[in-house]
Amino acid sequence: MTDIYNIKINSLQNKAIDLSEYKNKYILFVNVASKCGFTSQYKELEELYKMHKDNLMIIGSPCNQFGSQEPGTSEDIEAFCKVNFGVTFLMTEKIDVKGSKQHALYKWLTDKTLNNSKSSSVKWNFQKYLVSPEGQLVDYYFSITKPSSSKITKHLI
């Protein structure tokens, strides 16, 4: 099993993110897009983050692979998220979450041989992956699952 905390990824501002800073917290990874029917989930993600920020980090990863619904630059994405939803949780650089250029983070999240839990494929924007404070994949949730769903929040209590 590969350690998720060793995976390298940059923020939307092109600064290195050290995932090990979030050891001992749950991390909810979400592939996000600004022009999707599920984009309104940004609001619930922000509310969830504010409610549980002592034991939860949310990390959004912009992705343009589903319906070209995240065409903007890093600056566009950051402005959209702040102005429309007041997003304060962590956002990564735009990445691929599937296919031949799949980012190492999403390789780990979707491959049982790496995460030692489950294999999956990212089906659409706003699919969610919950990682435990010990760095284990807890579960994944399709786009239709709201951030406030008890399927997710039961782990945070």
Task: Please name every model-derived segment.
Residues 24-26, 35, 39-64, 81-85:
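Conserved helix-turn-beta segment immediately C-terminal to the redox Cys motif
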Residues 107, 112-157:
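Thiol-/selenol-based redox modules, centered on thioredoxin-like
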Residues 11, 31-35:
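Amphipathic alpha-helical repeat scaffolds
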Residues 31, 55-73, 88-99:
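Thiol-based oxidoreductase modules, predominantly thioredoxin-like and allied folds used
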Residues 1-20, 40, 104:
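N-terminal "domain-start" segment that seeds a small globular fold
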Residues 75-123:
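Short, internal strand/loop/helix patches
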